[in-house]
A protein has these predicted regions:
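N-terminal pre-domain/capping segments
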Residues: 1-142
Length: 142
């Protein structure tokens, strides 16, 4: 088993690769290209730049979570074919750059929904949380 840590990238994570490298036993990160729109092809150049950044910190990219899947694929609308082709190209590009593990989800519209991003636990730690009542109160038209 490999010990990894989720890393949101240098633009989006307050935890640096240098800090992750200091955690005993952690050898890699699970990451993604957060500034890439769903359905956009990940070029080999962008993938390689991400890998290089991680490797320069003494870690490696253990996997991707995730390549965002365009809602056209998830909902089955006609324009999905182009996005399926783009997704396949991205997976091929990841493989060519040595990344062989990709986590994915096919949840349409809301994707991974959380209603709270920092619920405080009794010990002072924070966790993600989901409350169905908050979702029920949403107005999708707004």
């Amino acid at each position: 088993m490999e010990m990894t840590l989720r890393w949101y990238g240098s633009k989006f994570d307050t935890v640096t690769l240098k800090q992750i490298r200091q955690i005993p036993g952690v050898t890699g990160v699970i990451t993604t290209l957060y500034d890439t729109a769903p359905g956009e092809i990940w070029s080999r150049e962008r993938i390689r730049a991400m890998i290089n950044e991680v490797e320069e910190a003494g870690l490696h990219v253990s996997g991707i979570e995730s390549v965002n899947i365009h809602d056209a694929i998830k909902t089955g609308v006609p324009e999905r074919e182009q996005y399926i082709d783009n997704y396949i190209t991205t997976l091929e590009n990841l493989g060519k750059e040595g990344i062989h593990m990709v986590c994915y989800n096919f949840m349409p519209v809301f994707d991974w929904t959380r209603t709270e991003l920092a619920r405080v636990r009794p010990d002072g730690s924070t966790v993600l949380a989901y409350t169905q009542e908050a979702i029920d109160a949403l107005d999708p038209e707004k």
